UniProtKB/Swiss-Prot annotation:
Lineage, top ranks: Archaea, Methanobacteriati, Methanobacteriota, Stenosarchaea group, Halobacteria
A Pfam family that the UniProt record links to this protein: eRF1_2
Superkingdom assignment: Archaea
Domain comment, as recorded: The N-terminal domain has the RNA-binding Sm fold. It harbors the endoribonuclease activity.
Main location: cytoplasm
Assembly notes: Monomer.
InterPro entries, alphabetized: eFR1_2_sf (IPR042226), eRF1_1_Pelota (IPR005140), eRF1_2 (IPR005141), eRF1_3 (IPR005142), Pelota/DOM34_N (IPR038069), Pelota_arc (IPR023521), Ribosomal_eL30-like_sf (IPR029064), Transl-rel_pelota (IPR004405)
EC main group: hydrolase
Name of the molecule in the record: Protein pelota homolog
Requisite cofactors: a divalent metal cation
EC numbers, comma separated: 3.1.-.-
Amino acid sequence: MQIQSQETTAEGAERIEVVPETLDDLWHLSYVIEPGDLVSGDTTRRIQRNDDNLRDKGGEREPMWIQIEVTDVEFAKFANRLRVGGEIVDCSREDQLGFHHTLNVEEHTELTVEKHLKPDQADRLEEAVEATENPDVAIATVEEGEAHVHTVAQYGTEERATITSTTGKGEYARPRKELFDELASVLKRQDVDAYILAGPGFTKQDALDHFQDEIPDIAEQITVVDTSAVGDRGVHEVLKRGAVEDVQQQTRIAEEADYIDELMARIGSGSEVAYGPEEVAKAADYGAIETLLVLDERLRLERAGEGDWDIDVDQIIETTEQKGGDVTVFSAEFAPGQQLSNLGGVAALLRYRLD
């Protein structure tokens, strides 16, 4: 993420000109931009008159600059864009004021956002700027007859390929070389800077030996990790053991996996923990929170007035920080975030038990 400029408006809001550079940056912006914000940028639009009829029946779009007051935000991961919709409040064509418009924000789209930044949103922007230099990582997990490839992004992991076959002995057995060749082909297609090769037993080492002969440039970028499983379980083990941190220091997913494991362990033992909005708000008031864990999707819903909490989520965050606690915002796209969602979307690791 590039921040081209930032200034405070006469109304006390922040006016920030940003340029998202990656899909991760669009994901970050989906949790910074919220209803009521002012967002502006260049776009194209079919011209409408006040009677709602299209002036141009041919459907041609006219380029223009617009500013909208945001009503809805959607991170369309599979379309590689962020959709920001709202009412046009300023425009290079005055006859378009008051109509609804959706800005389709893609990588390298210049965008200006005016809003009162909350502390976690300012942190998220800073994280996105710092993450620009982080390497992208692919995780290949392999065992006899089976291989999977995932890529790691800040919004979660994504499965890129699954390869299954019968290897070993027998009339219909597929030579291991074919499995390794197909895996190598998948790895070559990934636009990443580093690779992790994981799995149980010796198959991964045999695969690495094959890669050193067939794709030596990629083999030089591979880190080998022992896991007890492949696929999603194997990837979780890789993240939990910190292997991704070795090649992508700023990734948040490994940290989330550690936090959720600690949270579940404390719940199991009945020790210093709180979960659910009421319990966590009480812990915040007592100054007992060491680390607050909150789901990004829950933040968005509550701030938009679409949630079901009776507790103000921003008040929990502010109270926690004022009393010396840390705040970690979880991604709903990754397994630890899904586990946190099952606990109400918010939990806390405490300094001491609350009776």
